[in-house]
Amino acid sequence: MTVIKRNGSEVTFDITKIIAAITKANESVDESIRMTPMQIQRIAESVEFSCLKMNRSPSVEEIQDLVEYQIMAHGAFEVAKNYVTYRYTRSLVRRSNTTDEKILSLIECCNEEAKQENANKNPVVNSTQRDYMAGEVSRDITERILLPQEIVEAHREGIIHFHDADYYAQHMHNCDLVNLEDMLQNGTVITGTLIERPHSFATACNIATQIVAQVASNQYGGQSISLTHLAPFVEVSRQKIRKIVEAEMASIGADPGAEKITELVEARLREEIRRGVQTIQYQVVTLLTTNGQAPFITVFMYLGEAENEREKKDLAMIIEEMLLQRYQGVKNEDGVWVTPAFPKLIYVLEEDNITEDAPYWYLTELAAKCTARRMVPDYISEKKMRELKGDVYTCMGCRSFLTPDRFTDAGIGNIANAKNYQPGKHKYYGRFNQGVVTINLPDVALSSGGNLDKFWKIFEERLELCHKALQCRHNRLKGTPSDAAPILWQYGALARLKKGETIDKLLFNGYSTISLGYAGLYECVKYMTGKSHTDPAATPFALSIMQKKNDKCAEWKKAENIDYSLYGTSLESTTYKFAKCLQRRFGIIEGITDKGYITNSYHVNVTEEINAFEKLRFEAQFQHLSPGGAISYVEVPDMQNNIPAVLEVMKFIYNNIIYAELNTKSDYCQVCGWDGEIQIVEDNGKLIWKCPKCGNTDQDKMNVARRTCGYIGTQFWNQGRTQEIRDRVLHL
């Protein structure tokens, strides 16, 4: 068994340290009231037993809490008092020097929490370490100076989660839809250099990747671009290539005829599209931003965005090439094709591609093959999204969705000064999310003790606490000058404001959103009703919880003219933190707090047996009540030899739910070449990854790709998320 120290490093559990600490406190009291060595030994053994029952690595603080409890349980109150006093004195010393130990542990690569905090960041490399070091300083300033203490304490206790505190010291927003069309068609500026409208598709792709990197370096969340914004440059290249081919034919005195020339032009055009798409794929996974990671980028593929049939056909060629290259994958350092984490791909299911007789059905078949092998694309239903939101648009990065455009309907106009603004047309590209605060629903339930009246009272209080935290997020952005991130606010990615102008007008009237997140609906309902929220007897209670959160968002929105929106939090590493906090506050409760994770958002619990179609049908009603963002998934086996089944799931998505994905496995052992599933096994109380063929357990010598929270993770996960991945049951 191992222990997580305060600086995040991991050490072997040592019972003698507990005995020594209790003995020291014991010796500080009068001899007449001291405990015997046998009592101290029993306390230490009891603490060790409690830690083993956690099925995870306990923190030093948790161990000390257990020691305090056991000393008092033995009636040694004076000893307990001295033990508490010693802890408090030590905490004061640590508080006076809040970041040094954590930063040093990051530099020396012994911080286990940092190693597993983000499934797409490698904390060993210098660039990532610099980001983490800056994050520690930001988090420290945030907790000591910038945030109200009640929010800091609620965050520490896992009552709420104040997302991305490591970026809060700066005036940065979360995620967005990049207005790539405006930047490519009307020019932009990158690091002081004017970038004019590109004269070929390949150049447009190259500029797009530079924009993506610049945007990622000026925010902390994900971003999305649309292939539709690249499609007009296919025709630009077509005309350019035609002139070159005609000149070549003339130079040699050849006249192959218009049909042959067109064939040659289209062949060269296809090659340019291949190179352009390859530029996007390889630039995205090899670029490093100031965040110490590849850009968290989503590529949107929606035929319905095309302006005309010619552009739609050109867009289809780009989508086809994007899918073909993702199906192939990228090579790892051993030259083996593996699954990359980025870009995330989203493919829209629509009338033109959802049936066998549709003109673009071939793209849907290719998408199905790609999903079966590489876990992307994910799918948005044009039909369901238009029904529920009125428009069809992509999420910002992983799952965060904008609210439907209300500022255009209100006649507010082009507040971002975009050069591609069309009066009366709803606007989505160029909009963004201000930030997220998540409520821990199981904590609300457990705090109520199962009393329904008490539950709703506590729920109301916690929601208002989240509201206060979200107002802090909003106010941190108010007054931000456009100069803070010129690529975003001055040169078209989000707006074209004047130098020195603040971004304030973009924070109101629904131009941007701010998200109330939630997690653990399953555990919350299970504790309050004794049943899963899939049980018809418990579903109405689950839906009433969802409706209450939406009602609060509507109330805040009306009062402040800010688009608060309910968001199904993705909880990448926070699932482990919430689980540990619940165990510390309420103990181990079977089916509620007995794991190292809590269930994401509204999802069916990962251990619950349910088929793919029933899961999607059930979760659709909750996705409708998460307008600020949510995604559903089904866990499937290797489907590469059963593409018709994948297509059936996709058709079901089209008819039943806005946004969903299929999860499979994509692994490779660099020691023996095994390309089946790398397994999760327990070793000395810790979950590790192990090749079933050769027994390799070295994470540096294997490629493992798993769906983490909408994105694909490839850098491994903390113990809580790893346990959740292990516990997932198949739905097909």
What are these regions (language model features)?
Residues 1-110, 726-731:
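Charged, amphipathic alpha-helical regulatory modules used
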Residues 14, 681, 686, 708-711:
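Conformational switch/transducer regions in large eukaryotic molecular machines and scaffolds
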Residues 23, 467, 471, 522-526:
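Amphipathic, well-packed alpha-helical segments that form the structural scaffold of globular domains
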Residues 89-510, 531, 535-697, 703:
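Conserved catalytic cores of very large enzyme subunits
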Residues 273-277, 281, 526-527, 721-727:
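Metallocofactor- and cofactor-centric catalytic cores in central/energy metabolism, strongly enriched
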Residues 301, 514-527, 547, 707:
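Contiguous, well-ordered alpha-helical segments that form the cores/surfaces of helical PPI scaffolds
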Residues 695-732:
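Long insertion/accessory domains within large nucleic-acid-processing enzymes
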